[in-house]
Amino acid sequence: MSVSPIEAAVGLAIFGSIAAIAIPTFSSTVHASRLTEATEGLATIAANTVAQAAGKSPSEAFPTSVPLTPANVPRGHAEVDAPGIWDAPTWKAVDFRASPEGVPHWFSFELDSNASPNVSSFVTHAHADQDGDGLTSTFEIHGHDDATGATIEPGMYVEKEVE
C-alpha cells in the first residue's frame, strides 16, 4: 500500500504541529527545573540562617559572610564541584551544599551577612549562566533580625532568570 502525496502532507503537518507544541514545552520544563535549583537552594539557606539566629542577639544572629561558591559561575553547563568547596564554616552552619557530592549543578551561591547591635541582615544570592553567553541570572532572598526576632523578608528578587 503506497502513501499518496496528500496523505504524506497531512502526516507531515500533524507531526509538525506536535513538534511545535512539544519542543517549546520541553524547553520550558528544562529551564523551570534549573530554576528550582536556585529557588530551593536559596530557600534552604535562608530558612537555616534564620533558624540559627534563635535565641541570639542581632549582633550574633547570623553566620559570617561566605563568598560565591563556586567562585566561577558555571557557564553554559552544569558542573561538578571540587572536593571540599562546601566545607566553609558558614556553609556547614547553614547546612547547605548546592548538590550532593559528585552531582553537577548550574548555580553558584553566596551568603552576605551584616551584623549590628540592634538590627542584623543577610542576603543570599544564586547566580548562573545557563546559556553560556557570559551574562548571569541573579536570585536573592533577604532576611533580618531585630528585637522581634529573625525573619525572612517576603518575596524573592529575580533578574534575568533564564540567562
Regions picked out by a protein language model, each given a short descriptive name:
Residues 1-30:
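N-terminal single-pass transmembrane signal-anchor helix
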Residues 106-117:
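Short amphipathic beta-strand and strand-loop transition segments with alternating hydrophobic
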Residues 129-136:
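Acidic, glycine-anchored loop motifs typical of Ca2+
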